[in-house]
Amino acid sequence: SNRFANYLLERGLQKGERVGLLLPNTAEFVIGYYGILKAGGVVMALNPAYTPTEVQTLAAESGIRLLVLAAHSYSRIASLRQSTPIERFIVVGEMEGELPDDDLSWAFLMENGNAEAVTTVQVEPDDPAVFQYSGGTTGTPKCAVGLHRNLVANVYQFRQWLVNTQEGRETVLVAIPCYHVYGMVLGMHLAIRLGARMVLISDPRDLDGLLDAIETYQASVFPGVPNIYAAINHYPSVLAGEHDLSSIRACISGSATLPMKVKHEFEALTHGHLVEGYGLSEAPTATHCNPILGENREGSIGLPLPGVTCRIVDLKTGTQEMPVGEAGELIIRGPQVMLGYHQKPEETAQTLREGWLYTGDVARMDEDGYFYLVDRKKDVIKVGGFQVWPSEVEAVIRQHPKVREVAV
C-alpha cells in the first residue's frame, strides 16, 4: 500500500481527490484501498459488473482521474478516457499485448514503487475516506461521503459487539463485496482491527470454493447475507455431511430479513452464532445488531450499537416521536453517520436534519429496545384505505413450507 500511496502522490494526487477501484475481492483491492487512504485520497469503489455507461456516469460525477481495474475489464472500459476525467488506468493481471503509454501495469508498480512510509500527508478524522454509490434514503442514486472517523467508529462499535472473538486468533471470511461499505467495514476493517487473517472470496456464488475456504483456513467470522447462508444450508454436499464447518463462531447477516429457519439451520450446521443486523451506506455500515451471545428476537434487527441513538418518528412530519410498539420512520444519530451526499445539498438537507439521519425505513421498537423493520417508507401499498407493507405480505408467504425465498 505504501508503493501505491507514493505513486499517487508522485502523480500529484491532491488531498481529498477521488481514486477509482473497479475490482472484485482481491489482494489488489485491499492494497489499493489502503494506499489511497494513506495518500490522503478518497476511495471510489465500483462494482466490477457495472456497464461502461454506469462507470462513465460515476467517473464523471466523482471526478476520478485514475482507475484501477482488472485486465479482463480493460477492453470495455478503456474507451471512457475520451468521455470522463479518467487520465490513466492501472491494470491488474495479464494483458494480451502491450498497454498504451498512458496506462500502467499493477505488477510493474508493485515491483518498482517506493515502499517507504508516507510522511508528507496528514490525514484527519474528519477527512473524507470513501464515496459510496447508493440509492440513498429516497431511491435516487447519489454518493454518500463517509469520513475516516465514520469508518473507524463503526469497526470499533462492532468489535465491542463480537464478544466471542479474540484478538490475533480469528480468520475473517470476506465474501461480501469490498466495493460496498458492508464488505469494507465488516470485512476488511474488522479483520484488521481483530488482527485476523483475511480470506477474500471473489465469487461467493461458487459454493464449492466458499466451503473449501471455510475448511482450509478455518474461518471463524463470516459476515454475509441471508441468501448465502440459505444456500449453504441446502447445498447437497453440506447435507451429505461432507464439510466441517465447526470453525465458524460469529456471523452477521445484513441487506435483507434473516428468516429464523435459515438462522436455526445454519447454527445447527456450524454450532456458531448467526445474528441479524441493520445498516446503510449513509452510516457506513452498521447501526443495529442482535446480540451475538444474548437474546435474538424473531423479525428484529436487534439493538443499537454502542454510541448510537435512535428514534421512531411520525411519517408525515418526522418531528413527533411515536409510542413504543407503533411504526414510524427510523432516525439515527451516531459517530458513523455520513458527512452528506456529494454535490447534493438538497438531498443532504432532506436526509440529515439537526444531526439525525432519516433512514427512509419504517420501523418500530418494542418495550425492551429491540427494533423491527416494517418496510421502506416509499414502498407502502394502499389498499381500500389501508396501508399494507410488502414485508407483511412476504412474512405470510414465507410461512409456506415450500417457499425458500420471497419478494413482493
What are these regions (language model features)?
Residues 196, 219-224, 233-297, 309, ...:
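Gly/Ser/Thr-rich phosphate-binding loop
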Residues 323-338, 356, 362-363:
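AMP-binding/adenylate-forming core of the ANL superfamily
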Residues 311-331, 350, 367-368:
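Conserved beta-loop-beta connector loops within the AMP-binding
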Residues 11-13, 17, 113-127, 131-174, ...:
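Conserved adenylate-forming
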Residues 50, 56-59, 67-69, 222, ...:
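AMP-binding/adenylate-forming catalytic core of the ANL superfamily
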